[in-house]
Every structure is written in structure tokens, then in C-alpha cells.
Amino acid sequence: MSPRALVIKVTVGQEDAERCSQGFTVAATAAAAGAEVTLWLTGDATWFGTPGKAEGFRLEHAAALSELRDQVLELGKIKVCTQCAKRRGITQEDLLPGIEISGASSFVAEILTDNTQSLVY
């Protein structure tokens, strides 16, 4: 039996730092535990797929967002919402290597797969 898949969507950025950090923390922890993790960055979280943005994120008593992002990228997948990227002028070339732009149909296909749990932060 393959490991259970976990799809996490983070919809906020620095404006709701605690919720944002929780999403990244759960994604990195699940990936380290062996789950098949896909982290979706939507809304203002989209910026964290670009170089330098996660490095500037600060939240007291929380792991560095850039380290959590890198762990998820190493052990799982990170996708950025197509519409969210377009609204912010972000192209595939602007994203870190390994992060891809993908649309709602891809997100829905992932969360409707058997043995998959989805969480939204």
C-alpha cells in the first residue's frame, strides 16, 4: 500500500503569519513522516514560491519558512495557483526550480484521488 497523500493549500502570506506558518509546518512534517505531500500556494502565499520572499518571513517561535519550503520541495511537490500567479505578474521563470504553476482542475484532481486528505490554511 502506498503512503497516504496529503494536499495542503496555503491561502495567506505574512498578513496572517501564524496560519501561513502552520500550513508550511504541517506540510514539512508530513513529508518528513513519509506522506506524499503537495503544497499549493495560493493568494498571497504565491509569493513564497519566488526567490527571497520566504527568507523575509518572520514569526516568533516558528521554524524558518524558507527551510520548511525547501524541505517540502525536497520530499514532495509545491504548486502555485495559475490565476494567483497571473494576478501578481509571476511567471514560471520567476519561481524557484521545482515549483510549478498549475490550475484548479489539477488541484481538484489531486484532492479527489483515493486515499488523499486535503487541508486548507
Region annotations inferred by a language model:
Residues 45-59:
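N-terminal beta-loop-helix "entrance" segment that forms/cooperates
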Residues 5, 36-38, 77:
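Residues at the starts of beta-strands that form the adenosine-phosphate
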Residues 20-35, 39:
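Histidine-anchored nucleotide/phosphate-binding helix
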Residues 79, 88, 92-95, 101-109:
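A short aromatic-anchored loop/beta-hairpin motif
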Residues 7-21, 52-53:
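Short, glycine-rich nucleotide/cofactor-binding loops
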Residues 8-9, 38-42:
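Short, conserved beta-strand edge motifs with alternating hydrophobic and charged residues
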Residues 55-85:
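A glycine-rich helix N-cap at a beta->alpha junction
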Residues 119-121:
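Aromatic- and Gly/Pro-rich donor/ligand-binding loops
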